[in-house]
Amino acid sequence: MITEGAQAPRLLLPPLLLLLTLPATGSDPVLCFTRYEESSGKCKGLLGGGVSVKDCCLNTASAYQERSGGLCQPCRSPRWSLWSTWAPCSVTCSEGSQLRYRRCVGWNGQCSEKVALGTLEWQLQACEDQQCCPEMGGWSGWGPWEPCSVTCSKGTRTRRRACNHPAPKCGGHCPGQAQESEACDTQQSCPTHGAWAAWGPWTPCSGSCHSGTHEPKETRSRKCSAPEPSQKPPGKPCPGLAYEQRRCTGLPPCPVAGSWGPWGPVSPCPVTCGLGQTMEQRTCDHPVPQHGGPFCAGDATRTHICNTAVPCPVDGEWDSWGEWSTCVRRNMKSISCQEIPGQQSRWRTCKGRKFDGHRCAGQQQDIRHCYSIQHCPLKGSWSEWSTWGLCIPPCGPNPTRARQRLCTPLLPKYPPTVSMVEGQGEKNVTFWGRPLPRCEELQGQKLVVEEKRPCLHVPACKDPEEEKL
């Protein structure tokens, strides 16, 4: 179906499906969660473990895992997850390829015919992080040695070279160092004056809390070794003292460790259907920690799974709209290829409502006005090149990508609105049908011109869940 003002569709081959991973459907115990996060594909709100998939999925908003850190499966009817982000390009320069995937997730069914739960669908596209690859440069010859770094005793001298024979390109560099140094001797002795090394750490106080009998003290020391003064020629000694002492101030009273009181009563189950959590609490007050004593070890609360054994209501969900019916006008055999407006309709089904859940909101039937151009010969014009499509097959040998130019029909200049029933105002009219466009021959073709290219540096398709094991 072509509507007025719409762009010509791109021709894409279907992506390849592979790697089946079937979720738990039996009675083996699983980890049960309150919800499934669509954006990340992760389970959220742990209820607990040791329950069957059937009990966990009494509430279709819940989700489960067969093991900690494993694949999260929602309890709702199966559907495709969101596409993952594109993986990094397979090469860092020039043209490469990159992959992304989505998975069939849910419980007790299939995403579509022959597409089981856990199935991965892959997409592959070309990518280019950097147009050119780095080219290494070459060094010039070494320059002359610079003067010695000191005027007495021994020092170092340096010489340099430039990375310009040739210069690197596209982010490249020259291997090795741009300068080198060597020792040099002035044959002149220098006096070395003494300097203190850093203070050592304070020794522990003689007491850690108030005792009422003495004032604890702490001491630290340092050495005249950074450097030591020279003997010939003589250097100056370090000024000041090598030791210092101070009183320990602000010491606290001796600490008292805290201890837990008894567990309180178990709270009621907070839900009326599916699984919930009950809670017990205790207080760190037997005794309360004092004067910096440690708090009670362990948790102040603990939870237990409670099972109502009652299924939760499941709201109905609209299925996809069906195809538009043929554009017709009452009491007329055919209105195709004529400036005569008609009507067409499409339907949808409310599916999945259970246990007194809400019915689907909105209308089951959609009606619109239309002009029929089914099988009408129309003058056409060639479209611009479409964007490059995905690489097909994404996980098979020798994937290719394609783009097309299409013979697009020029729609008749019929009125865009009509008044079908007096008093109901103007209604928009849509062109419907598959016309027969006619374009001048292009590259030996009359309807579609296609160009194909191979996809380069293709990475392997690997299940991200298997890489975690």
Swiss-Prot record:
Presence of the UniProt keyword DNA damage in the record: no
Pfam family, one: TSP1_CFP_C
Record's signal peptide: 1-27
Coiled-coil regions listed in the entry: none
GO biological process, one term: complement activation, alternative pathway
Disordered, as annotated region: 218-238
Subcellular location: Secreted
UniProt keywords, alphabetically: Complement alternate pathway, Disulfide bond, Glycoprotein, Immunity, Innate immunity, Repeat, Secreted, Signal
Intrachain S-S bonds: 32-56, 43-72, 57-75, 89-127, 93-133, 104-111, 132-170, 148-184, 152-190, 163-174, 205-248, 209-254, 224-238, 269-306, 273-312, 284-296, 327-370, 337-376, 350-360, 391-455, 395-461, 407-439
Glycosylation site positions: 83, 86, 139, 142, 145, 151, 196, 199, 202, 208, 260, 263, 272, 321, 324, 382, 385, 388, 428
SMART domains assigned to the protein according to its UniProt record, in alphabetical order: TSP1
Assembly and interaction partners: In plasma, properdin exists as dimers, trimers or tetramers in the relative proportions of 26:54:20. Interacts with the pro-C3-convertase enzyme complex (C3b-Bb) comprised of Complement C3 beta chain (C3b) and the Complement factor B Bb fragment (Bb), where it binds (via its TSP type-1 5 domain) with C3b and Bb. This interaction stabilizes the complex and allows it to become the active C3-convertase enzyme complex (C3b-Bb-FP). Interacts with C3b. Interacts with CFB.
Biological function: A positive regulator of the alternate pathway of complement. It binds to and stabilizes the C3- and C5-convertase enzyme complexes. Inhibits CFI-CFH mediated degradation of Inhibits CFI-CFH mediated degradation of Complement C3 beta chain (C3b).
Protein name: Properdin
Organism: Pongo abelii
Gene behind this protein: CFP
